[in-house]
C-alpha cells in the first residue's frame, strides 16, 4: 500500500523520521513523535494509520484532532491525494455542522479530521458513532495545548470508550503530557535534534531593497523560482491585498489568504494552493 501511496503523492522516498514512525507503530503501543515543523509529520502518522485500518469495518475507525481548520483541510487534501479505498472527511467551526453531518452520513468515512470543539459537537450529537473509534491522533499537540483546547480534547477522549491506540505529534518537547490523553505503554520518538536538522532542511537568504522597489524586487525574486510553490508572508491584510494584485497584474498564478476573508474564500484559496496555484500570501497571523 505504501508504495502506491508514495507514487500517487510523487514522493520517491520517506525520511528517517517517517520510517521510524511506521515501524514503531507496528509494535502496538501508544506513540509520541517529536519532530520539527515541516519535517513531514503528516505522512508519519497517516501512513501507519492507513495500514491499521480495516477495510471491512463499519463506522469511523480513527479521529485526528488538529488545532485549526486550515490544518484539517490540508490533512484532508493529503489523505484524498493518497487515493486509497478509505474515505476521510474534515470538520471544523465556521460552517454549518448540519452540512458536515450530511457529509459524514453520505461518505461513511473511516477517518474524521477536525478541531476539538467541532469534534465534540458531532460526538455529543452522535453524528459519529463513538463505539467504532479505536485510534486517536492529535496533530500539533503542543499547539492544541497552547490554544487552550485541553478541556475540549479531554471531552473528546472521554467520549471514546473503545479507544485502543493514541498517536501524539508535536514540534516541541512538553515537560509533561496531561493525564487526560490516557497514554499507556508509550514509545517516544524524538527527532528534535534541531540545529543540525534545521540547517540541512532550511536555507536563509536576505534580499535588501529600497521600500519603493520592494514589489519589483519580489517579482524578480519569484521569477527565479520557476514553478515551485511559494508562500509570501506579509505583515498586514492590506499588504496581502496589494501584493496579490501586483503579482496578478504580472500574470502570476497567485492566491491570497488572510483573516479578514470569508471562510469560503479562505478555503478556496487554500485548496487552489494545494492543487494548482504556486504562490499564496498569508498574513503572519491569518
Where are these regions (language model features)?
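Conserved nucleic-acid-binding Ia/Ib motif block in the N-terminal RecA-like helicase ATPase lobe
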Residues: 58-121, 253-257
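Post-DEXD/H (motif II) to motif III coupling segment of the RecA-like Helicase ATP-binding lobe
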Residues: 130-194
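Conserved pre-motif I regulatory segment
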Residues: 1-32
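Conserved ATPase-coupling elements of RecA-like P-loop NTPase cores
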Residues: 75, 121-126, 143-153, 243
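Single conserved hydrophobic/aromatic residue that forms the stacking wall/gate
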Residues: 277-281, 285-286
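Conserved interdomain hinge at the start of the Helicase C-terminal
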Residues: 201-235, 241-246
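Walker A/P-loop NTP-binding motif
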Residues: 23-27, 43-56
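Loop/turn-to-beta-strand initiation segments
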Residues: 61-63, 87, 108-111, 132-134, ...
